[in-house]
């Protein structure tokens, strides 16, 4: 036994896929009887779509979803506006030859989880449901994990324990790390999946009485389903019962309409908005990822995306350490992901308080394509003349001279060394790819670019020795 993962949501499943495809044995435990049934985290960012492309599930994700629909805003029965996601949130979405997935993709979370679980099983893994972590102890070389499966206790011995068990993480609480931040006690968010009669077209239907979106009831079309996801924010004292009748009354109260009839309530949840983050992502051999490490408002759709990318950052590093890389490689997980989580916390909180009001400052960047690890210890750039692309940045896609996409070359568990005319050193288990400089790759012919397994640039240099020294630190 090598790794125990607590939690079979998008974070835990992504991490399990990353480990099992590298030959790392792991046990994925979840206290629920099955996968999460709701649509909750439904918007996949361009960067998350790239992660799923690398995992080999892009076709399933594409067929299971649709482009993010526009918002249709109603004042009673009248349609008063139709706006894109870009217009509603004041964001921008980059495009170009280096970006294969230029927009957000709408996939209900239950479907994303199903696709990830199917992929995990193809890699030889699985999930143990009705099984929860109830305690653990760790030594310098191992962690012992106490679990309860259907009431029966079991003691597991593992190299590492990863808490990917959500905002109420048992692993985090037992680990005893700080979880500072704020809770918005004066408000609640109601969310669920329901069928609705009386609506036409694929939109996010924003129901209001007078066109003012601050008091709204939203219904999102869900692809591949007859259900809608509904969302409504409210004061704590106005929370209704979690029943179909109460939600139906809320629709009438918010919209002034009785022609929209709800039925078949599949899932419903009421939650307090928190903006909190741990002060440590790892303590010894216990690691936190996703909502177990940071929670925030759903505004801007950053939660699932940030969590998946936590797992993607951690997976290759954890596997490398298990195979013999220096353990301090794991320190770079917190070094790189904690600033990202802090930034997302601030962004989502700002969007939450704005409540669709226009931004007063720069447009919020929701696509996550600009996340960079520049300045971190795994970003080495010793060139004298540096262009726009730097070590620590995401490696852009490109069309190669042979007609193949660069992302097709990067896909997999390996490092890739990009050359632009210079003689590349021969390195075992590193893919060598010849390229031509371009606006996205504004480099000289003597530049070497080493791309990490997670698609970020580890090295930009003109020295083969720099590449070899870097690899000695990470493999």
Curated annotation (Swiss-Prot):
Oxidoreductase as UniProt keyword: yes
Record localization: Cytoplasm
Regulation: Inhibited by anhydrotetracycline.
EC numbers, comma separated: 1.14.13.231
Entry keyword annotation includes NADP: yes
Catalytic reaction list: a tetracycline + NADPH + O2 + H(+) = an 11a-hydroxytetracycline + NADP(+) + H2O; tetracycline + NADPH + O2 + H(+) = 11a-hydroxytetracycline + NADP(+) + H2O
Primary enzyme class: oxidoreductase
Cellular component GO terms held in the UniProt record: cytoplasm
GO biological process terms held by the UniProt record: response to antibiotic
Family annotation (InterPro entries): FAD-bd, FAD/NAD-bd_sf, RIFMO-like
Induction of the gene: Expression increases >200-fold after exposure to tetracycline, doxycycline or inhibitor anhydrotetracycline but not tigecycline; expression is repressed by upstream TetR (MAB_1497c), is not under control of whiB7. Probably part of the TetR-TetX operon.
Cofactor (UniProt): FAD
UniProt-listed Pfam families: FAD_binding_3
Phenotype of gene-disrupted mutants: Cells are about 2-fold more sensitive to tetracycline and doxycycline, but remain sensitive to tigecycline, a broad spectrum glycylcycline antibiotic.
Keyword annotations of the record: Antibiotic resistance, Cytoplasm, FAD, Flavoprotein, Monooxygenase, NADP, Nucleotide-binding, Oxidoreductase
Gene Ontology molecular function, alphabetical: FAD binding; oxidoreductase activity, acting on paired donors, with incorporation or reduction of molecular oxygen, NAD(P)H as one donor, and incorporation of one atom of oxygen
Summary of the function given for this chain in its UniProt record: An FAD-requiring monooxygenase active on some tetracycline antibiotic derivatives, which leads to their inactivation. Hydroxylates carbon 11a of tetracycline and some analogs. Confers resistance to tetracycline and doxycycline via an oxidoreductase activity; probably monooxygenates the antibiotics. Does not act on tigecycline.
Any further remark recorded for this protein: Although it has a similar activity to Bacteroides TetX it is phylogentically distinct and is thought to have evolved by convergent evolution.
Similarity remark: Belongs to the aromatic-ring hydroxylase family.
Name used for this protein in its record: Flavin-dependent monooxygenase
Annotated organism of origin: Mycobacteroides abscessus (strain ATCC 19977 / DSM 44196 / CCUG 20993 / CIP 104536 / JCM 13569 / NCTC 13031 / TMC 1543 / L948)
Gene name tied to this protein: tetX
């Amino acid at each position: 036994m090598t790794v125990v993962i607590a939690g079979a949501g998008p974070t835990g499943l992504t991490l399990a896929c990353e480990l099992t495809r590298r030959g790392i044995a792991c046990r994925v435990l979840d206290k629920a009887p099955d996968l999460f049934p709701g649509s909750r985290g439904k918007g996949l960012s361009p960067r998350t779509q790239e992660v799923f492309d690398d995992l080999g599930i892009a076709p399933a994700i594409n067929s299971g979803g649709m482009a993010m629909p526009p918002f249709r805003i109603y004042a009673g029965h009248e349609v008063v506006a139709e706006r894109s996601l870009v217009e509603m949130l004041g964001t921008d979405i980059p495009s170009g030859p280096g970006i294969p997935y230029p927009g957000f993709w709408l996939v209900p979370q239950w479907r994303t989880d199903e696709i990830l679980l199917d992929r995990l099983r193809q890699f030889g893994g699985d999930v143990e449901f009705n099984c929860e972590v109830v305690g653990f102890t760790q030594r310098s070389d191992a962690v012992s994990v106490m679990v309860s499966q259907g009431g029966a206790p079991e003691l597991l011995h593992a190299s590492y324990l990863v808490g990917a068990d959500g905002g109420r993480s048992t692993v985090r609480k037992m680990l005893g790390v700080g979880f500072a931040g704020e809770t918005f006690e004066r408000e609640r968010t109601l969310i669920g999946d329901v069928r609705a009669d009386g609506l036409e077209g694929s939109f996010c239907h924003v129901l209001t009485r007078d066109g003012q979106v601050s008091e709204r009831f939203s219904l999102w079309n869900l692809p591949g389903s007859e259900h809608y996801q509904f969302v409504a924010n409210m004061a704590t004292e106005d929370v209704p019962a979690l029943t179909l009748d109460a939600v139906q009354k809320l629709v009438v109260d918010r919209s002034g309409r009785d022609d929209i009839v709800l039925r078949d309530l599949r899932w419903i949840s009421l939650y307090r908005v928190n903006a909190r983050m741990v002060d440590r992502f790892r303590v010894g051999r216990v690691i936190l990822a996703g909502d177990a490490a940071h929670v925030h408002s759903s505004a801007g759709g950053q939660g699932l995306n940030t969590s998946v990318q936590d797992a993607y950052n951690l997976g290759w590093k954890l596997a490398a350490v298990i195979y013999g890389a220096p353990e301090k490689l794991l320190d770079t997980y917190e070094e790189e992901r904690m600033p990202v989580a802090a930034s997302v916390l601030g962004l989502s909180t700002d969007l939450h308080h704005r409540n669709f009001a226009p931004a007063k400052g720069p447009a919020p960047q929701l696509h996550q394509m600009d996340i960079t690890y520049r300045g971190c210890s795994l970003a080495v750039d010793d060139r004298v003349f540096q262009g726009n692309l730097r070590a620590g940045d995401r490696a852009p896609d490109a069309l190669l001279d042979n007609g193949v996409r660069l992302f097709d070359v990067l896909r997999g568990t390996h490092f890739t060394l990009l050359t632009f005319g210079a003689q590349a050193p021969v390195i075992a288990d590193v893919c060598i790819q010849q390229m031509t400089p371009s606006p996205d790759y504004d480099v000289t012919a003597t530049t070497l670019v080493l791309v990490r397994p997670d698609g970020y640039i580890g090295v930009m240099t003109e020295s083969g020795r720099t590449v070899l020294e870097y690899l000695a630190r990470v493999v």
